[in-house]
């Protein structure tokens, strides 16, 4: 039987070394593959005292924390709250009411005809 054991996501000495070498001017401008090879050479060239100090710092380094996932119920509730349906505008209501008049036209022409009808109506009523 497998058991879930919470574990600290610790980092190793080499990972800490790579993090520290991020701003090394010798590595700037190199391709990623070349940068990895160069970092590896630099790490292998460290003396044992430096490696031991690096391992000690890596052991003391706080581990990366996993992000807690939100339960699905909370996500669904949040999505329901934020996505309230908007009331349709006057134009949308007009289009819905009059789109059937131009049933035989292709969709693009149908929308142009409804828009033209909307503009005519707006001119008649005196609205901008």
UniProtKB/Swiss-Prot annotation:
Disulfide bond annotation, renumbered to this chain: none
Protein name stated in the entry: Kinetoplast-associated protein 4
Quaternary structure, from the entry: Associates with the kinetoplast DNA network.
Biased composition annotated in UniProt, kind: Basic and acidic residues: 65-76
Keyword Transferase listed: no
Stretches the record annotates as Disordered: 60-87
One GO CC annotation: kinetoplast
Subcellular location: Mitochondrion matrix, Kinetoplast; Mitochondrion matrix
PANTHER family according to UniProt: DNA-ASSOCIATED PROTEIN, PUTATIVE-RELATED (PTHR37564:SF2), KINETOPLAST DNA-ASSOCIATED PROTEIN (PTHR37564)
Stated family: Belongs to the KAP family.
Entry-linked SUPFAM superfamilies: HMG-box
Biological role: Histone H1-like DNA-binding protein involved in the organization and segregation of kinetoplast DNA (kDNA). The mitochondrial DNA of kinetoplastid protozoa consists of about 5,000 minicircles and 20 to 30 maxicircles. These circular DNAs are held together by catenation into a highly organized compact disk structure referred to as a kinetoplast DNA (kDNA) network. Binds preferentially to a specific fragment of minicircle DNA and is able to compact kDNA networks through DNA charge neutralization and condensation.
Gene assigned in the entry: KAP4
Stretches of the chain forming a coiled coil according to its record: none
Gene3D superfamilies: High mobility group box domain
Superkingdom of origin organism: Eukaryota
Native source organism of the sequence: Crithidia fasciculata
Keywords attached to this entry: DNA-binding, Kinetoplast, Mitochondrion
Annotated GO MF terms: DNA binding
Propeptide stretches in the record: 1-10
Keyword DNA-binding included in the entry's annotation: yes
């Amino acid at each position: 039987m497998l058991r879930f054991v919470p574990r600290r996501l610790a980092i190793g000495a080499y990972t800490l070394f790579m993090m520290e070498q991020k701003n090394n001017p010798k590595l700037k401008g190199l391709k990623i593959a070349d940068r990895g090879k160069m970092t590896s050479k630099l790490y292998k060239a460290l003396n044992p005292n430096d490696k031991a100090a690096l391992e000690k710092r890596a052991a003391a380094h706080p581990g990366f924390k996993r992000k807690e996932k939100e339960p699905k119920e909370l996500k669904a509730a949040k999505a329901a709250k934020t996505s309230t349906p908007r009331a349709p505008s006057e134009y949308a209501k007009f289009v819905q009411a009059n789109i059937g008049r131009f049933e035989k036209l292709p969709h693009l022409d149908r929308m142009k005809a409804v828009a033209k009808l909307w503009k005519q109506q707006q001119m008649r009523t005196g609205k901008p």
